[in-house]
């Protein structure tokens, strides 16, 4: 029996819809659960941003260069690309309507698609709509609940895809920058586009830097002795990334941050255009921590660094850590804080 093709287009065509996991009208993102060849699959579709024919920089009075977006006369622009119009209503000087804009795979694609296949139950929980809670993770809670979970997530080949990128040349055509030598392996890292970025519009630039060090899974593993390493990383990122995009983005226009809890437990850094509002909670308080703040905080936490700090963050009910102990701990925290329990029946606001 011949093996079915596993290229992206063939897999998408074989996708059998099961349910909608999540739909966000603000970010224009929808996640669908389905199957491909009887194995679970997740497709995430995101509406692409409007594209301009060219982005350039022109010098301004303060010596900086400012972005100039032009060539909206392009046939695929949001003006000349209009093929159909339907007015919704108008009032005085205000008009509302719908339009169909000419699409082209290279110049003006409709959406960006991400596929996870085969998808694990952990993937499905991550993309499924869920309630979130703020929890205070103490050092004791980390060692008792979170650390065993992280160790489990780092075993059984769950990080194989990361090692493929670092050592096996996977996604090599997408790598923006690589700094690695056997002599200074622990200082090495590489930068590549995050799945959240369409790779075309710099306003939504979203990159990820993955380090070669394996002793750091999360910020919990950062000690005071790592402070200079983080400073060097931060400075290298701010020096390198602008040049990779012809200086259309400046060093001080990069939001450089770390997630806790991260989506995978190999230390990595998010690099986002400051114009980008983020998708979901990717740059929100309770998830994102600026690298500059991490570096500064290490000045005050002592030799053990973040291992001795209580960290407050948002956790979804679908996350395995919620049922492994964080839900119970949060209930205890609310009781200790004197926060009254929510009534079982709430009739509405008075």
UniProtKB/Swiss-Prot annotation:
Keywords: Acetylation, Cytoplasm, Hydrolase, Phosphoprotein. This is m7GpppX diphosphatase. Decapping scavenger enzyme that catalyzes the cleavage of a residual cap structure following the degradation of mRNAs by the 3'->5' exosome-mediated mRNA decay pathway. Hydrolyzes cap analog structures like 7-methylguanosine nucleoside triphosphate (m7GpppG) and tri-methyl guanosine nucleoside triphosphate (m3(2,2,7)GpppG) with up to 10 nucleotide substrates (small capped oligoribonucleotides) and specifically releases 5'-phosphorylated RNA fragments and 7-methylguanosine monophosphate (m7GMP) or tri-methyl guanosine nucleoside monophosphate (m3(2,2,7)GMP), respectively. GO terms for molecular function: 5'-(N(7)-methyl 5'-triphosphoguanosine)-[mRNA] diphosphatase activity; exoribonuclease activator activity; hydrolase activity, acting on acid anhydrides, in phosphorus-containing anhydrides; identical protein binding; protein heterodimerization activity; protein homodimerization activity; RNA 7-methylguanosine cap binding. Present with 9920 molecules/cell in log phase SD medium. Pfam families: DcpS, DcpS_C. It comes from Saccharomyces cerevisiae (strain ATCC 204508 / S288c). It catalyses: a 5'-end (N(7)-methyl 5'-triphosphoguanosine)-ribonucleoside in mRNA + H2O = N(7)-methyl-GMP + a 5'-end diphospho-ribonucleoside in mRNA + 2 H(+). InterPro entries: DcpS/DCS2, Histidine_triad_CS, HIT-like_sf, Scavenger_mRNA_decap_enz_N.
């Amino acid at each position: 029996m011949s093996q079915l093709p596993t290229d992206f287009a063939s897999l998408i065509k074989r996708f059998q819809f099961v349910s909608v996991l999540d739909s966000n009208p603000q970010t224009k993102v929808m996640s669908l659960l389905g199957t491909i060849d009887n194995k679970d699959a997740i497709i995430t579709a995101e509406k692409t941003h409007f594209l301009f024919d060219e982005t350039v920089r022109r010098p301004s009075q303060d010596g900086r260069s400012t972005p100039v977006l032009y060539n909206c006369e392009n046939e695929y622009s949001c003006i000349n690309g209009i093929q159909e119009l339907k007015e919704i209503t108008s009032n005085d000087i205000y008009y509302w309507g719908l339009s169909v804009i000419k699409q082209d795979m290279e110049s003006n694609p409709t959406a960006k698609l991400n596929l996870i296949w085969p998808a694990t139950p952990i993937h499905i929980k991550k993309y499924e709509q869920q309630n979130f809670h703020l929890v205070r993770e103490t050092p004791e809670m980390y060692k008792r609940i979170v650390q065993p979970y992280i160790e489990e997530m780092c075993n059984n080949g769950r990080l194989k895809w990361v090692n493929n990128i670092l050592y096996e040349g996977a996604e090599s055509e997408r790598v923006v920058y690589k700094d690695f030598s056997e002599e200074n392996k622990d200082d090495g890292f590489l930068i590549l586009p995050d799945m959240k970025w369409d790779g075309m519009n710099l306003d939504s630039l979203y990159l990820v830097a993955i380090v070669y060090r394996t002793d750091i899974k999360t910020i919990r593993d950062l000690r005071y002795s790592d402070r200079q390493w983080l400073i060097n990383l931060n400075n290298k990122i701010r020096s390198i990334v602008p040049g990779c995009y012809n200086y259309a983005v400046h060093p001080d226009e990069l939001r450089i941050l770390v997630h806790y809890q991260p989506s995978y437990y190999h230390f990595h850094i998010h690099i986002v255009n400051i114009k980008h509002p983020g998708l979901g909670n990717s740059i929100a308080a309770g998830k994102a921590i600026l690298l500059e703040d991490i570096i500064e905080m290490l000045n005050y936490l002592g030799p053990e660094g973040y291992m001795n700090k209580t960290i407050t963050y948002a956790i979804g009910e679908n996350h395995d850590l919620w049922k492994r102990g964080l839900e119970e701990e949060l209930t205890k925290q609310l009781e200790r804080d004197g926060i009254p329990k929510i009534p079982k029946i709430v009739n509405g606001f008075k």
